[in-house]
A protein has these predicted regions:
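Cytosolic, long alpha-helical scaffolding segments
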Residues: 1-206
């Protein structure tokens, strides 16, 4: 449904819909955001979309790097214990969530401008990539919390659980590699495979 809405040619309507579905939560304004707002306020729209899309590509790469760090640290907490706590992981998870909101808002604003079919496709892929990064980040956070609970109760993972975590770690890394390629602008990177990977992770964690 969301993809169909994005393809509608009614920019003003799309922006209202996007604002309605985005979380009603204050988002910190960064220097890059101020630059973006200035760019969008320009009356010279020629080339603005390309510049804005390139900026968002860079920010998505940063968001992906943060998620990759959380994946790595979460599995480290499982393997070595969470005796030092998981606050750093939680802080990065919040950063990922905020980045997702900020970038989603930026994309909705770009879509208000007249777009080429290529730009529309690029922006649609960006929405998909953002959602995938956030979901993998959620998996990492849940895993870290699980490891912390096990640590607090003085329990240990069974050999079977360790094998499952090893499979899950490899699956997460596979998904991150696909997202890395997609975030770099590889239009051939099959995002449908990322969805399948997320489903495999869900199956393991049930």
């Amino acid at each position: 449904i969301s993809t169909t809405l994005i393809l509608l040619p009614f920019g003003a309507l799309l922006e209202k819909i996007a604002i309605a579905i985005l979380p009603d939560k204050a988002v910190p304004v960064k220097d890059a955001d101020q630059w973006f707002e200035g760019l969008m306020a320009s009356k010279h729209h020629l080339g603005i979309s390309t510049i804005a899309i390139n900026q968002i590509h860079d920010e998505i790469k940063g968001m992906l790097a943060t998620a990759a760090e959380n994946v790595s640290q979460s599995f480290k907490a499982v393997e070595e214990g969470a005796s030092e706590g998981i606050q750093a992981i939680a802080d990065r998870e919040e950063e990922i969530d905020l980045s997702n909101m900020r970038l989603s808002q930026k994309i909705s604003k770009i879509l208000v401008l007249d777009q080429t079919p290529k730009d529309i496709d690029t922006l649609n892929r960006m929405y998909t990539i953002l959602g995938n990064i956030e979901r993998i980040g959620d998996h990492a956070m849940n895993l870290a919390e699980y490891a912390e609970t096990i640590e607090a109760k003085g329990l240990q993972f069974s050999n079977y659980a360790k094998k499952e975590f090893a499979v899950m770690e490899e699956t997460c890394r596979e998904g991150m590699e696909l997202l890395k390629a997609a975030a770099a602008g590889d239009t051939q990177s099959p995002l449908s495979e990322v969805a399948e990977i997320e489903q495999r992770i869900d199956d393991i964690t049930r």
